[in-house]
Amino acid sequence: GITVNPKIEKLRLKKIKNYILCLMLSQGVPMMLAGDEFRRTQNGNNNAYCQDNEISWINWNLAEKNEELVAFTRRIIQLRKNHQVFHRETFFSTKTPEIEWFDFTGKNPDWSNPSRFLAFMLDGSMCMNGDGKYDNDFYVAGNTDIYDVTITLPSPHKGKKWYLAADTSIEGNDCIAEPGKEECLSEQKRYILPAGSFVV
């Protein structure tokens, strides 16, 4: 519902960014409803086809009001488009480690543990971009717990380093880097991921 509480609004914005990030970095075709990128909720009505009123109309003023989310969505879509590893032409094989799963300690996750953290690494050497070069490796982690977690990062492949592409815990437009402007992490072995956040 409608609120003027800044803490609730901040949490909602972060959760929306988390959902859009997960959608855009998943395999397959991402499906968004017009206006998701600027918080058009239809007041919770997910079956508004017969509503010829404010519920189903698109209020374009929301795009200006929620410019930060529009910019985030634009950049995460660009990240997806720039990297074949996020939209592969074939499904993962079991013969090569195209995708590896991790818990926060950097080990294989215990799938029976009700942890609120999960991470995966996509091997870019298994995908070529449109320019004929192998893609980058990507590590994506989600912490849905109410506590911050210190992640043990997997070792990057030989000659590579980890760069920060997105962190939904960071406020404003700095939560996602412009393509080509990602910052190299000063700490290559660990990363503190705040509660309820995702990092790429």
Give the role of each language-model region.
Residues G1-I8:
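Alpha-amylase-like alpha-glycosidases and glucanotransferases acting on alpha-linked glucans and related
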Residues E9-L13, K17, C22-M32, D36-V200:
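Carbohydrate-interacting/catalytic domains
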